[in-house]
Amino acid sequence: MTQQEMKKIAAQAALQFVKPDTIVGVGSGSTVNCFIDALASMKDQIKGAVAASKASEGRLRAIGIEVFNANEVSELDVYIDGADEITPQGAMIKGGGAALTREKIVSSLAKKFVCIVDGSKQVDVLGTTFPLPVEVIPMARSYVARQLVALGGSPEYREGVVTDNGNVILDVHNFHIIEPLKMEHTINNIAGVVTNGIFAQRYANVTIVGTPEGAKIIE
């Protein structure tokens, strides 16, 4: 079974967490694209969605789902998103698609975060397989990079990428993130950092793993 097929299995299983007459929080990325495609079957049962990226917003509108601005809602019932890495405790690294700040905003509005992944994204310690993305205000790029080196990381400027917010991304290699919540706060306190891709304060309440045997749900 291909990775794409396992993503589709996880995405389809996430529909059970979408309640009728609600506004759904929708993340971004390849697994979320599978979820949006699956959500088309429920488009007449939900009020609409809040999207964490312009790409997801466009995909939702293309299938006829109304998209709301995050400022128009006070709370979401559920937020569905993927991850680049996720631990058994539900802490994640996200931001491979550079939408991490908006993903943090929309996920913070939700009562429940459902993370949909294939098995390759499961790790015991964050930083094992994927660098940590950090969104940075452009004028602070060099300063922030030096601070990340001081923390033990090896930051790499993501060439040619500008976020939906007009900022740049540093991908930090060589982090072995034993205490995700502490590291999330430490990096966010560096002047010029908009946010980083550790999702530990807003962790996943439910993880759905697509496997050849079907969807495995971890709560």
UniProtKB/Swiss-Prot annotation:
Active site per UniProt: 103 (proton acceptor)
GO molecular function, one term: ribose-5-phosphate isomerase activity
The UniProt record lists the keyword Isomerase: yes
Catalytic reaction list: aldehydo-D-ribose 5-phosphate = D-ribulose 5-phosphate
GO biological process, one term: pentose-phosphate shunt, non-oxidative branch
One Pfam family hit: Rib_5-P_isom_A
InterPro entries: NagB/RpiA_transferase-like (IPR037171), Ribose5P_isomerase_typA_subgr (IPR020672), Ribose5P_isomerase_type_A (IPR004788)
One GO CC annotation: cytosol
Assigned keywords, A-Z: Isomerase
Assembly and binders: Homodimer.
Protein name: Ribose-5-phosphate isomerase A
Lineage: Bacteria, Pseudomonadati, Pseudomonadota, Gammaproteobacteria, Pasteurellales
Gene name, Swiss-Prot/TrEMBL: rpiA
